[in-house]
Regions:
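N-terminal cap/lid segment of alpha/beta-hydrolase-fold proteins
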Residues: 2-37
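Active-site glycine-rich loops that stabilize anionic/oxyanionic intermediates
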Residues: 47-60, 122-123, 252-253
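Glycine-rich "HGGG/HGxG" loop immediately N-terminal to the catalytic nucleophile
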Residues: 54, 80-96, 282-283
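Conserved alpha/beta-hydrolase
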Residues: 61-90
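Conserved acidic catalytic loop of the alpha/beta-hydrolase fold
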Residues: 100-117
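Conserved hydrolase catalytic core segment
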Residues: 115-156
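Alpha/beta-hydrolase
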Residues: 159-261, 271-275
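Catalytic histidine-centered segment of alpha/beta-hydrolase-like enzymes
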Residues: 279-294
């Protein structure tokens, strides 16, 4: 961290529980919880598409979320909202907000507070691999929860809505969608139920509360997530991440992240892979931070971090 970064970090350590970071073009709002105990690195919890950092602060049924759980474990916790999400400003061209632009804003946050553990979910996975390669001094470890792989691993899908629609049930491709980039994408409730709130662990009695938390998404981000037209976020060389501790965690009820897909991402990146049923944890879908055993999975991640001395 340079002198300016160190000064900023000292200021943040005395700041109230929220602040703004990111790039000039794409500022991001950040919640800050807890205080670091000796020897424990801060952790940054990054949400996926259609969500905000609120998914880490509390669960849909009102229990404490992963952010307070990590704070109780003795870590300083930072929870950003992507640009244009939650309390982060939305520009008029939000529909074409790219993965790289979001990653650059998150990279700026890590440069201010790092080195840190970076925990990512779903569509923020490709951003984590990119940030770790671009700014390795800021990322001490990565925990990927059902994370998207780098586009290096994804087949190039045609930039054709009709052709992609024929692949929408192909779990090996992540059940892809292709959307027009002339307006933000509003996620319909039936999509949420099919892919995000589908598991037996999801608190279905709180689905309406969850639905109200979902925000419009950049159409370009969605297309990049499925490597439509080969425009997904790539890394230059997985060897650049070979010395980085990486954990990938996946449940058995996530149609967009079957075991084979996330295991392949782990092999490519040299990561440790946890298929939750092998730890006696069954029934989790795409949103384990919201599900009824969220504390159990948070404890698994905390134990991994502590075993690594992070």
């Amino acid at each position: 961290m340079d002198h300016a970064g160190a000064t900023r970090r000292q200021a943040l350590s005395r700041a109230p529980g929220c602040f703004y970071s990111g790039t000039d073009a794409h500022p991001i709002y950040v919640d800050r919880l807890g205080a670091a105990q000796s020897g424990k690195l801060p952790i940054v919890l990054v949400h996926g598409g259609g969500h905000t950092g609120a998914c880490y602060l509390t669960t849909p049924d009102g229990r404490p979320g992963w952010a307070p759980a990590f704070a109780v474990s003795g870590r300083e916790v930072f929870v950003p909202d992507w640009p244009g999400h939650g309390r982060s400003p939305m520009r008029p061209d939000f529909a074409t907000l790219s993965s790289t632009e979001i990653a650059e804003s998150l990279q700026r946050l890590l440069e201010e507070i790092g080195p840190a553990v970076l925990l990512v979910h779903s569509a923020s996975g490709p951003m984590a691999w990119w940030i770790a390669e671009q700014s390795p001094q800021t990322v001490a470890a990565i925990v990927g929860v059902a994370p998207g792989g780098p586009a290096n691993l994804l087949p190039v899908l045609p930039d054709d809505a009709e052709a992609v629609a024929k692949l929408k049930d192909d779990e090996s491709l992540g059940c892809p969608v292709r959307v027009e980039e002339d307006r933000p994408l509003f996620i319909p409730p039936e999509f949420m139920r099919a892919y995000w709130a589908n598991s037996e662990r999801f608190p279905q009695q709180a689905f309406e509360a969850y639905r109200r938390s979902i925000v419009p998404e950049s159409a370009r981000l969605m297309n990049e997530r499925f490597n439509i037209g080969g425009k997904g976020l790539r890394i230059a060389d997985p060897a650049n991440l070979s010395k980085l501790p990486i954990l990938i965690v996946t449940g058995d009820s996530d149609p967009r992240h079957p075991r084979a897909v996330d295991a392949a991402t782990a092999r490519y990146l040299g990561a440790e892979f946890v298929w939750l049923p092998e730890r006696g944890i069954a029934g989790n879908g795409h949103m384990p931070m919201c599900e009824d055993n969220s504390d159990e999975i948070a404890a698994l991640i905390v134990a991994w971090l502590e075993a690594k001395g992070l």
